[in-house]
Each structure stands twice: as structure tokens, then as C-alpha cells.
Amino acid sequence: MRPLLQNFLQGQLSSIEVSEALQPSNTLIDVRTSEEHFQGAIPGSRNHPLFDGLERSLIGKLYRQVGKEAAVERGTSIVAPQLEKFLNTLRPFQSRLLTVYCARGGMRSKSVTRFLSSEGFRVQQLEGGYKAYRRHVLDFLNDFRPPLIVLHGRTGVGKTLLIRSLPGSIDLENLAQHRSSIFGAVHLQPRNQKNFEGLFYSKTCSKPREEFIFVEGESRKVGQVFIPEAFADAMKNGKKILLKASMETRVRRILEEYHPRDEETLFKIESILSALKESLGKDVVEQLKTLLHQNKFEDFITILLEKYYDPRYEHGMRDYQYDLELSAEDLEQTQRDLIGFHSAQPIHGNKTKYS
């Protein structure tokens, strides 16, 4: 057996648990297939696949139908010619502490950890792999109910702009890569549930549980993903602030965010409009398409707000009671007002002193 291959199968193995692996000092290496990595990965991890999807499927089939020995033999025959190349892709990280993971902490991550250790790397395996990480994340999210200051207001009022500028905030739309509206995916690549939850955990796991957090009022679903149930409950019970701005201001802010930059974007927007025929009627949709092609974007946005967004918002929020109402015409002033409201909040559970 060649030395590289022998080390791949029989080298030393060091392993750690999820909480240790997530320390900033670790560089995470995901040796699963690129398809697995895309479907869900630990944020910040680098994908260095040991097999491609077809190879993994073949090895898994052998394991189930013939047995472990046959699967290992086949996997070894696939890996052997590529070990030198695989090693070279990781050489740039040799000075770092590496943590290798696969799906469940099985042969893929064990073999790579042994191999890299024999080649002089500081390396350890993540016990339980990505499955253990997911369990760790979900355990946290199922119990994460922080005190929240929830910003409400009609579309275009500036909620997202404020969330991005406020200290101690969570930008759910950024984590989801979706603006939580029918046009919310324009210019963005929405994330799936697993990656959203991983990023949500990374953003929140170190926050003090008693400290108020700013968040934008959302429904349970943001684009393709669902907000964790415990956090959604915290949003319902949080301090609610209503932001107000003129139609002119709202139109301007929406245009800055969504402005059609090319023909592809215009085509996407027009395609989405077709889905509104039932709620707006054919005539209004055709009017909107005409305005879009005439580059009359301000008129286009105004009609959408008046006939679609505002009525839906009023219906969904009519039973809400707000702790505070603020003008959002001047966002710098609104930011100062919100920070003042935040500073006035006592320890979680006591009544606010702000007036």
C-alpha cells in the first residue's frame, strides 16, 4: 500500500464536539459533495469534496447491498489517484487549525482527518458531522426567545434601512436573502431553510439573553424559509413600534432598492405581475406592465402600494397595539429615537419607562 493511502486509512485521529468546532480559531473543512454543501453547510466552512455525487451514490449502494468492506475498497480506489491533488488544495491552510466534517462523522471525515494529520496538519474531526451541528443549532433555536423591539410600518417606510443601521439588530431578510414580499427575490439569491437557520444561529448565539434586540416585523415565512417558532413567538410578544412616512418618501426608497437595472430584471418583475391578476384584476396588471415598459417607475410603485401592499398591510396589522409611533421621514432622527427607546428598556420582563 502506498504511504499516502496507508495514512488515509490508518493515520491518527483527533475529534472534537460541535461547541468546540465553532470557535473562531477553527477553519472548517466540509468534505461532503458540493450538492450536500449547497443544501446545508456550517457557515464559513470551505467545501473540499472527497467524492462527487455519483461516486458517493455508488459507494452508498455498495455499502447497503454488499457491505462495509466493499464500500471502503471502492472508495479507496476512487480516492487513491486524487490524494496528491486533494492535499495540494489544502496546503494554503496548513498553518491553521482545521476541523473536518462530513454528513455524520463517518469514513469521509475520519479518513481525511487521519490523512492530513499524517501530513503535518493541525487537524481534528467534528464528531457526528453536519448532523450533530444541525441538532446543536435546532436545540438552540427551539429555546431562543429574546426580548425584542419589533419595527412595523407600511412597505417602503424604511424598516430594513433602520435595521441595517441599528446596533443590536437581526436582519432577517438579509439572512434569508429575500425581502419578504412578492418581489422580494429581485436582485437576490434566496437561501434555503438549513442555511438560513445556520446563519441565524451564528448571528444570535452569542447575544445576551436579557438584552433587547431590534428586528423587523415579519410573518412567520420570509421568502422560502420559516422563522424559528420560538423567535416568532418572541416577535409577537415584543415591543412594537409603528413607523410612518409619506407616500413620496416610500416610493423613493423602494425605487432605490428595487430599481430595474437590466432587461432581465424587468422580465422578472413583469413575470411576477402576472401572478397578481386575481388580486388586482387584469386591467390594473396591464396598466402596471405598461408603466414598467415606459420606465414610469414612480407611478408603477405608487399604484402597487395603493392597490396591493397597503390594503394587505392594513388587513394584517389592524389588531396590533403599538408601544410607540415614530416618523420615518428622517431616518437619522428615527434611528436616534429608536436607540433612546432601547436604552430606556429595563431588564427583560419589567414595564418600559419610555414615554
Where are these regions (language model features)?
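Flexible, polar/low-complexity N-terminal or interdomain linker segments that lie immediately upstream
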Residues: 1-43, 137-154
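Positively charged, proline/Ser/Thr-rich regional signature most characteristic
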Residues: 22-92
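Short glycine-/polar-rich loops that comprise or flank the Walker A/P-loop
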Residues: 43-44, 146, 234-239
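Catalytic cysteine-centered active loop of the rhodanese-like fold, especially the PTP/DSP P-loop
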Residues: 73-127
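Glycine-rich phosphate-binding P-loop
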Residues: 108, 147-167
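Long, charge-dense
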Residues: 125-138, 255-259, 269
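Conserved nucleotide-sensing/catalytic segment adjacent to the nucleotide-binding pocket
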Residues: 167-234
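Conserved NTP phosphate-binding and transfer environment spanning the P-loop NTPase/kinase superfamily
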Residues: 234-239, 244-355
